[in-house]
């Protein structure tokens, strides 16, 4: 908001690389079915308290949806309407 911003391309590259690292960490974490809230430790370095739960859930779901779109994970909705995510297996279904 005052001085012009310089270094846009460098900063964009840094952001993309950071998100790709986070996606890889999340993918590695999904070796077993997990809910979005179970994935917080893969993405956040600190404990997520009630005041940050909404933002953390939104950020986690965005990463999970990206992995879904890339067909790296799959989602299963259980009988209670809870979504569970895991790495997409080579073969087979959710147990």
Predicted regions and their residues:
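C-terminal regulatory/interaction regions
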Residues: 24-95
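Divalent-metal (often Zn2+) His-rich catalytic cores of metallo-beta-lactamase-fold enzymes
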Residues: 1-29
């Amino acid at each position: 908001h005052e001085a012009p911003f310089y270094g846009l391309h460098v900063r964009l590259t840094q952001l993309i690389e950071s998100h790709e690292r986070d996606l890889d960490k999340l993918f590695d974490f999904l070796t077993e079915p997990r809910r979005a809230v179970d994935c917080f430790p893969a993405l956040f370095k600190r404990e997520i308290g009630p005041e940050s739960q909404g933002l953390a859930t939104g950020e986690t779901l965005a990463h999970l949806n990206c992995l879904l779109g890339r067909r790296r994970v799959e989602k299963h909705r259980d009988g209670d309407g809870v979504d569970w995510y895991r790495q997409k297996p080579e073969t087979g279904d959710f147990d």
